[in-house]
């Protein structure tokens, strides 16, 4: 399997298999904070690291960075009733599917994001293998692990090769939360993280809160490429197939 990025790049120095230290956001842990561990898996080049960076740092890096083993991100978010949650994100390199550390990476996960590239059919086909690995290594978890199927690169709608129907059917048949994101534009990235965390903690998000997350992204986009009618129709269908948690 390849690793994330649009172009090939020289191999980078190998990282330690587990993080030696955590992000600065964890240094001043509040004992009252809830802590949620999200593990992000999927083929290389599907955009996993870009999604994590968009969530944790609200940025998008166009340059290629190969993930070897594991990258670690974290961010505090606020849910209704002033609930503070520390979200720890484990970004797993695409080559790790056959690695001996994959079980360690998945240990203690509350949520798993299975990411694929909507413009790459192979990354979607390989989702079956990734899901099998995830289920094998989380079956003994004390609490059920929430599974999320995440189609990335929706900003490249005109190059889509994985249909909305295939995405929805795969998610439904495997009891997964279906969602689409664009790491490049930020479209629904933060919302998806927030929804998944809220569902795990049994916290409902109001319609106003969901729409506020969407508006933040839309307000940051200066220019959107003009879409054909067919592209717009696919985009509308895609939006309807994206899960929205407990809107009251």
Curated annotation (Swiss-Prot):
Membrane topology: Peripheral membrane protein
One Gene Ontology biological process: regulation of cilium assembly
PROSITE patterns assigned: RAB (PS51419)
Keyword entries, A-Z: Cell membrane, Cell projection, Cilium, Cytoplasm, Cytoskeleton, GTP-binding, Membrane, Nucleotide-binding, Transport
GO molecular function: GTP binding; GTPase activity
Motif Effector region positions after renumbering to this chain: 64-72
Biased composition (Polar residues): 239-248
SUPFAM superfamilies: P-loop containing nucleoside triphosphate hydrolases (SSF52540)
Tissues/organs with expression: Expressed in amphid and phasmid ciliated sensory neurons.
UniProt name for this protein: Ras-related protein Rab-28
Species of origin: Caenorhabditis elegans
């Amino acid at each position: 399997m390849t690793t994330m990025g649009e172009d090939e790049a020289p191999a980078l120095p190998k990282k330690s298999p587990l993080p030696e230290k955590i992000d600065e956001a964890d240094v001043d842990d509040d004992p009252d904070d809830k802590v949620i561990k999200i593990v992000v898996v999927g083929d290389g080049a599907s955009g996993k690291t870009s999604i994590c960076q968009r969530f944790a740092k609200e940025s998008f890096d166009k340059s290629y960075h190969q993930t070897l083993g594991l990258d670690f991100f974290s961010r505090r978010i606020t849910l209704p009733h002033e609930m503070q949650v520390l979200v720890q994100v484990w970004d797993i390199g695409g080559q790790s599917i056959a690695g001996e550390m994959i079980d360690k990476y998945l240990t203690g996960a509350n949520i798993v994001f299975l990411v694929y590239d909507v413009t790459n059919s192979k990354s979607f086909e390989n989702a079956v293998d990734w899901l099998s690995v995830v289920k094998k290594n989380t079956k003994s978890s004390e609490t059920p692990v929430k599974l999320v199927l995440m189609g990335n690169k929706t900003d490249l709608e005109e190059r889509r090769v994985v249909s909305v129907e295939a995405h929805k059917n795969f998610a439904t048949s495997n009891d997964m939360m279906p969602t689409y994101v664009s790491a490049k534009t930020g479209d629904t990235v933060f919302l998806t993280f927030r929804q998944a965390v809220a569902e795990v903690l049994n916290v409902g998000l109001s319609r106003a809160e969901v729409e506020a997350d969407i508006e933040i992204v839309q307000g940051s986009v200066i220019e959107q490429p003009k879409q054909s009618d067919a592209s717009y129709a696919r985009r509308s269908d895609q939006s309807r197939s994206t899960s929205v948690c407990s809107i009251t």
